[in-house]
């Protein structure tokens, strides 16, 4: 059986790669594998398939003899935070993050609130393979009670992380992407005194990630133009990422957030070895500017779990991805978009500086272009020989073009895509090289497959 786990848990189109039967087996296998007797915490995003997958997983957990707590619709970071806070055995988040509405996923966290290891994934996979029965989908979804008290504990922790600072006097616009941030983002910012306007704020699972959120900033930019504010924040669907926009429409991505937040920690002398952890996607302009002020940037493979591993290994206190996935010591290194947005707002208020001026003090990014090569096949389902040939081809392309620019090529871990990042000193060079590389690489990959 092909591994059901990708780079970030289990992910796929509902009723195709991710079925009711598979979700049931995941719940059963997880419950059967855990030694700790305390309940398993479960949350989900607003996707339409979330309810039926929740029922499947909880049915499997019940069959294993374990108990569960249903948190309902919630931000992904609430799950790892509450696992550790409440001493729970494990946790599951039903979400496909930035993927389209027809996708869903299952992220599993251990008793420490960390994503499970490859070893643990293999144990679950083995048990699933041994569970041969095909589970039929029930005709009716049974509503499950949700635990609102735990959600209140998570919300309180975000407010406490403000260290007594309020946001009075700040006008802020939030794009909650029809997703998990709709549950609490507006209320948290308002409770701290901010004047808040929210867009895309209904729990509409059919609209998530569709022309909104952290991967499409046009609605937030439009809202800031129509109704001027000090800043805006756009969350991804499960609220573990965030991208900011200043009053002039300039983008504050994960690289800028790391630089500005990191510089604050450096000045407070609490940034271990002046070290930040990021990935191969981090902008070269960010790296050069960070080194110029005495900082060290350590790059990992793409994915928050690789950032987390490096943070642990290097004993860093801050890391993240350009996509807005920021991991800090504040909340046990779980990416939390709402927490990140609050911290940026806090520093602006505390320093009495508008985000536009603060952003100007960071760095000028190098022109960068990310292009997706769409595939009509799943790389993970190819033969080992074909996968090796594709990996070698990617390696050769990166080496061939490295003298002209910075090139980073990787297959997506969640979609049938190959992502090509090209970075150079001019937009013209980036565009021409990006076009050349993607066209030639597409031809080479088609030769391998055909």
Swiss-Prot record:
Active-site residue numbers: 97
UniProt-listed PROSITE patterns: PGM_PMM
Keyword annotations: Isomerase, Magnesium, Metal-binding, Phosphoprotein
Catalytically driven reaction(s): alpha-D-glucosamine 1-phosphate = D-glucosamine 6-phosphate
Highest taxon listed in the record's lineage: Bacteria
Record: residues binding Mg(2+): 97, 236, 238, 240
UniProt EC number: 5.4.2.10
Positions bearing Phosphoserine: 97
Post-translational modification (record): Activated by phosphorylation.
Keyword Amino-acid biosynthesis assigned: no
Cofactor(s), by name: Mg(2+)
A Pfam match: PGM_PMM_III
Co-factor: note: Binds 1 Mg(2+) ion per subunit.
Family the UniProt entry places it in: Belongs to the phosphohexose mutase family.
PANTHER family hit by this protein: PHOSPHOGLUCOMUTASE (ALPHA-D-GLUCOSE-1,6-BISPHOSPHATE-DEPENDENT), PHOSPHOHEXOSE MUTASE
Primary role: Catalyzes the conversion of glucosamine-6-phosphate to glucosamine-1-phosphate.
HAMAP family the UniProt entry points to: GlmM_B
Protein name as annotated: Phosphoglucosamine mutase
